[in-house]
Regions:
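Conserved Rossmann-like nucleotide-cofactor binding loop
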Residues: 28
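Conserved acidic
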Residues: 15-22, 31-35, 41-608
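N-terminal accessory regions of nucleic-acid-interacting proteins
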Residues: 1-21
């Protein structure tokens, strides 16, 4: 293990000189192999093509290589109309674990635009005032027929929406870097875009030096890995829980409140300090030392400690249960915790039982310029009805997670690359031979334990852990304001009984600014049933389903109507998705084809 942990600034990359296309297909049913036709658009020239076979589409892209081809959900669907399983497996990739960012084949770089726009294409179109319309029913139901010009226009509209999105996000990124999109390449993900903009606008002067040989500035900062590792232990993530809702029981007259951009809010709040990785120290683990740091406006701390909540004291600290899930209802906490929650716990009446380790750091405000600058731009765009407001919002919300990336060993799948690795002297100690299809020992790949995928050059858990801790404190205060009327919470929202409305709004700031709360349900939810985390159903006065939240299962049919069993965990649920590449390799399936899985809730399922 390295004795130094580094964080390095990322700048703008050189412009890509090849052509850039967007691609979309229509199929007979949810099956990339049942190709009806496809369309493409050159995002720079606007030239559009229609392909009546996947072979024609592939030939077009390879004849124009080197080029980049974007499709929305490319690695779950569209790509596998062009590449077969063997080709996709052997192709060189940019990936982190099973997350694929780019597949390279015959000098064509295939990319998935969902990494830039983590939303449905219809939502992207709506933001541009370019509604994509409804998918023709014959494609949904696999009723094969002649392709019409109306069909083609529908598919081309998808390409135009995606091309518009890529141009706009590239323009936004480049201008934020003080460049034009013709002078710099577009990063692979919205998180990478956010990090590069932050580096350009907010990198600290003391985080770097002038190289004596080149005379160029090197933007980098270092710390003892111990501090990064202990902050990783304090990185608990978001809070989702049933509070006073009884699982599976009806509750009447419910309201939902959401915090406006909670994570950007806590990042930019002037009272919130974050640890400077270049100024960290271990401190004698005593209660007095902890309290002194908490009361010092120049420093922040995090501690490995044990705390407990006496009877009647609010419980809100994250505890990892035996099932591997976070539990916020426990009266005892043991582990690493960041200062914001230690401070709130002491305020609410928690008692420190023992402190095992205590670390402190100089406190800094690294996000104020980044968030405040983007927020000002977002408000300008919003007042002008400019669709780029959505892009700015994504950039504001995508930064903090970049600091908490956990890189994984690089996978090597290309046969030539595997052969090269096997000839290296350090092969036995460096590489691990694995198989996607372990039963038949097929589709081998190597894990390179000396080289990681994903950027650990941006990893500083001090930022990601403290952002989440501050956010959980904001959420905890809202839940406490709801009192026994608080039913459910999910990261930045609270559901309460209507009778708790007056008290909640007295104690919590409401409005449209960063961090203020807003009533998302001006029409009261007449009836709700909360089953478990990420699973609840709302009903209107006529007992019709108003909203169904059920992570991992299908709740609507192809017409957008709720399924009969949607939102009823006592009944059989189904997930409907497409086969991804690595699943296809493991299970002997065809990527890009429909996959339906039956799911029965382990607690509530009663049979059909």
């Amino acid at each position: 293990m390295s004795s130094i942990h580094w964080i390095r600034a990322s700048g703008a990359a050189k412009a890509y000189t090849g052509k850039v296309f967007v691609y979309d297909i229509e199929t007979w049913g949810l099956n990339s192999q049942a190709y009806a036709f496809g369309c493409s658009r050159n995002i720079n020239t606007g030239e559009e093509e229609v392909f009546h076979s996947p072979e024609l589409a592939r030939s077009h892209f390879e004849e124009n290589a080197p080029c980049i081809v974007y499709a929305h959900n490319s690695f779950g669907f569209d790509l596998f109309s062009i590449l077969n399983l063997e080709e996709a497996y052997e192709a060189r990739k940019i990936a982190q674990g099973t997350n694929i960012y780019e597949i390279r084949h015959n000098k064509v770089k295939y990319r998935d635009s969902k990494h830039l726009f983590p939303m449905k294409l219809s939502a992207l179109g709506d933001s541009f005032k370019m509604p994509k319309g409804e998918t023709p029913i014959d494609f949904i139901e696999a009723n094969k027929r002649e392709i019409t010009q109306q069909d083609i226009e529908y598919c081309l509209l998808d390409c135009r929406i995606l091309a518009r999105g890529i141009i706009d996000i590239h323009d936004f990124y480049a201008s934020s870097m003080g460049m034009s999109r013709h002078d710099t390449a577009l990063p692979l993900t919205i998180a990478s875009i956010s990090y590069r903009i932050w580096c350009a606008t907010s990198w600290r002067d003391e985080w770097g030096w002038i190289d004596k040989k080149s005379g160029k500035r090197q933007n980098a900062a270092k710390t003892d890995p111990y501090f990064n590792d202990t902050l990783n232990e304090a990185y608990w993530g978001g809070r989702t829980q049933l509070i006073y809702a009884i699982p599976g029981q009806e509750v009447e007259n419910v309201l939902e409140y959401d915090a406006n951009s909670m994570y950007p809010f806590v990042m930019a709040h002037p009272a919130n300090l974050f640890p400077d990785l270049t100024k960290c120290w271990r401190v004698g683990a005593t209660k007095n030392a902890l309290l002194n740091i908490i009361n010092d406006p120049l420093y922040v701390c995090w501690a490995n400690l044990e705390m407990y909540a006496p009877e009647g004291v609010e419980r809100f600290l994250p505890v990892l249960g035996d099932d591997g899930r976070l539990d916020f209802n426990r009266s005892e906490f043991s582990g690493w915790l960041c200062e914001p929650e230690i401070r709130l716990a002491l305020k609410e009446g928690w008692i420190i039982k023992e402190i095992h380790e205590l670390n402190k750091s100089r406190g800094i405000r690294p996000f104020m310029n980044y968030i405040n600058g983007l927020y000002k731009l977002r408000k300008e765009y919003k007042s002008q009805g400019d669709s780029r407001e959505m892009l700015v919002k994504m950039a504001m919300n995508s930064l903090y997670g970049r600091f908490g990336l956990r890189p994984k060993p690089t996978r090597i799948e290309n046969p030539e690359d595997i052969e090269k690795a096997q000839k290296k002297k350090d092969y036995d100690e460096r590489y691990e031979l694995c198989f996607y299809d372990r039963k038949n020992m097929a589709y081998p790949y190597l894990l390179d334990h000396h080289n990681t995928s994903g950027s650990n050059s941006s990893q500083w858990f001090g930022f990601s852990a403290f952002v989440c801790s501050y956010a959980r404190c904001v959420l905890a205060e809202a839940i406490i304001a709801g009192g026994e009327n608080s039913l459910y919470s999910d990261t930045d929202s609270v559901h309460i009984r209507e009778e708790g409305k007056e008290r909640f709004e007295e104690l919590i700031s409401l409005g449209d600014e960063l961090g203020q709360w807003k009533l998302e349900t001006p029409v009261t939810i007449v009836k709700a049933i909360y089953w478990r985390k990420k699973a609840y159903t709302w009903y209107d006065k006529d007992n019709n389903k108003r909203k169904v939240k059920a992570k991992g299962v299908q709740v609507k049919n192809d017409k957008g109507e709720y399924l009969d069993h949607a939102g009823d965990m006592r009944k059989l649920q189904r997930s409907r998705t497409t086969v991804k590449l690595f699943s296809a390799l493991r299970r002997g399936l065809i990527p890009g084809t429909e996959l339906i899985t039956e799911k029965r809730d382990s607690i509530f399922y009663e049979g059909d």
